[in-house]
């Protein structure tokens, strides 16, 4: 039985705390001659603006409010900032207590006592998790005024005027004030004529070839960011076209405008000025024309040690690269050559330099490489560069061990062990061999097996990774090395004992991975993905899937049945009676009423789907577009496409291996097992929208559908979709929503189509503690398969009325490197209820679903 007291007690405590905090004095820690900043008001040309970009230029922010109260400030005020000083004064004025404590401890320990947790630790903790009062700082107000003026000048309002005003609030809100910033923008300036002044002919020729990509456009409003972007573009352009010594400081923009506001001439004349190279030698400054640099010699040092004399190393020439090594070259020269994007005679390029770093990292056998460029010996013109690449190898072998303690509703206690072994540079081509083993051993008291650890799951896999595309045809033009390609060949097995139906799973995979265009996007191409699932103990089905058993038992209890079917209480025996009951009905030796036939077929269909041995041979293509520019990117977006097909290859190979099933249909088999045939497509989109400096909206949408055809009437259980759970529709537990309006009557409800929409507002509460408000919409349906029940099916857009909608709130504690998450989801619109009764009418805590997870759901 679910315990509802704990959540109710928590809500009661929060309510009491809220009432107590509301009685607090917000200005308790504000000096008497100062004011608490209550609000910033920003007006642009007389109209109030809430534009986050503009408001962010106001340096001082008021304290944060939750439910109309500055709770973080109240918590801070509960702490005494002078706890140590007050304790020292108390000791001085109470000599008796001083003597007692000195006798109990020592004089030094009494002095340290004021820094202890008992004396000042609680106060420090309250102030650490709380928020200090935003005491109005007039210096920061005036600085904010200057920053606002600078911002509007940066977007073309050169004649703007910004003033600030401070308003103290009425006495009932003592020592509180608001600040008003009033901005008059004036006319905006626009770019007019665009000219260039370039002293180096070689620089000018490159500029002219790429000038169409400029950020500066005639007629566009002045934007300082456009000039910054143009400077970065030109710097990258020249550095990637041979100008090794090019300095960003050589790029300047001369902007001429009418400084007399009364003239109202808002056109700007812009000259892009690219000067010469400036070199400093002490106090001597010289200038030189920029010139193109070419790569001369390329030297690569494997297993480099700066303590070893380079002259003692052996070397080998491979194409235009000289490879140095000690004693024995452990890597194929071809692999090292292709990992290097630099080529003799090519112009110097920062991009190729970066590609070389990435490609060596992709080999996974070297630590981060070191690279240096020097002028070639006897190069009096100084336009030839020798490239030296220094590599340091990782350990040939590595071993990692893991362990964990487990507990669940099924398993009383258990432990898991794992080991991972890696062998690098296996065939001298930077290949990596990985061996992984996982074992979980647990105790399940309900089993007849009397051993303490009576359940287990053991799995192992072997993986071979090649740092290139391994394919009979040459793919280098289609997938060059700068896309950091990989080929993964993997095989694995898992073995369950006394868990569910005791599955034995065998899998194999040939996968290609590469990063097109930039390192953010990713392609995953599974040329072949084989999976065989063998259920060893299907007779245990009705012991595991209790909801399905109850449905069948409810049908059986309507009839007078003998010991062949039921026990002394009249219930079907799970191991034998259930199967005898279904078989005898299908064979005609036992009859039931017509109204029970369809539910019985549903149970039989469920049994067949879950106990079927699955044989899947699939191919898939996944493309991921990722905009993430930094680890904490609040403008993050990601779009993932996936298409998958299974069974077509086997259908061509095994066309002659046909069997006739009892229903008269013809199915192909391979190795005695019917193989799956289906087509699958998925689209997943995630987008984050900043709302303020510390809060943002997170949106996710998902659409997936898998259509069986040919050799299959439905898709395998392992390839189906489910709804509910910690990262999906949080008002329902996993597998407890759908399909459609069916009411989720089974233990594990799944289907072959899924639609999900999630919207979540994330905001700060106290320090590392964050909050969230969310809405989840979606469901699963059956489409184009052999499902008999209309409530399960997606027929047309009218079926969208059967989505489930949940709302809720969550708490997250951010440890920087991971997040602990607790979400409380409420089923707000339940498709299982009749039309007209689906919206929640009364909140009940027992219907709330608590979801615990690690990291954000999307």
Question: Where do the protein language model's features map onto the residues?
Answer:
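C-terminal motif of bacterial Sec signal peptides marking the signal peptidase cleavage site
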Residues: 20-23
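Interaction-mediating elements
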Residues: 25-362, 479, 497
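Outer-membrane beta-barrel pore domains and translocons
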Residues: 167, 273, 339, 343, ...
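Outer-membrane beta-barrel initiation region
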Residues: 289, 294-479, 596-599, 605-635
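Repeated loop/turn-to-beta-strand initiation elements of outer-membrane beta-barrel proteins
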Residues: 366-369, 396-399, 425-433, 468-474, ...
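Hydrophobic, lipid-facing positions within transmembrane beta-strands of outer-membrane proteins
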Residues: 385, 413-419, 456-462, 487, ...
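C-terminal outer-membrane beta-barrel translocator/porin domains of Gram-negative envelope proteins
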Residues: 406-409, 524-763, 774-777, 781-790, ...
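Outer-membrane beta-barrel "beta-signal"
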Residues: 813-817, 844-858
